[in-house]
Amino acid sequence: MAYAAVLLDIEGTVCPISFVKESLFPFFLKQVDTLCSSQDLQVQRLLTQFQVDDVAGHIRSLVARDVKDPILKQLQGLVWENGYKDGQIKAPVYDDAIKFIKNSDVPVYIYSSGSVKAQKLLFQYVESRSNTLDLRPFIKGYFDINTSGVKTQSESYARIANNVGIKPNGVLFISDNPFELDAAKITGMQTMLAVRPGNSEVRDALKYNPVTNFDDL
């Protein structure tokens, strides 16, 4: 399989699918009331965009339903930044993914529903035996739903390919979500299904070119 760039999903692909829902979401939810009473201008600007009376309740509802809301994603990034910086959060990136990102012969890009800010934080504070590891120097660029669109729409992948200056058929996209892979494939991108512990079983997984370890790439 020849490709000129790799586009990676995060949750369920380079780190356990449980990390977001069992670590990041609970950390954020504990800060919702404090967030809603914040006098920070950036936070206030984001909160007013919800245009609802019960902002805290609305935020909790979005998180509970795992809605990919762009305003929510930005707020989460702001809250998680504090958690990463004070050592409460470390990202459990798979060892084989760390090795692949550090040693890839082609540019590595990230595409996640989480904000670009949250993505950079995750890769800046990767859990390692020596406290934390910063993978940002090895990642060429980041894309999210604000910059590129929803991950289940083919137009999003066309935008990314255009942005990186590589034809879609020269990009390999790896994700645990078959709907995302279907969307990417429409543009001509090469695709692989990430099969990791805890991921949902995918029907007809073989047709999605499954990979269980990035050492096999």
UniProtKB/Swiss-Prot annotation:
The keyword Hydrolase applies. It is found in: Cytoplasm; Nucleus. One of its GO terms (molecular function) is acireductone synthase activity. It is an enzyme of class 3 (hydrolase). Binds 1 Mg(2+) ion per subunit. InterPro entries: Enolase-ppase_E1, ENOPH1_eukaryotes, HAD-like_sf, HAD_sf. PANTHER family: ENOLASE-PHOSPHATASE E1. This is Enolase-phosphatase E1. The lineage of its organism: Eukaryota, Fungi, Dikarya, Ascomycota, Saccharomycotina.
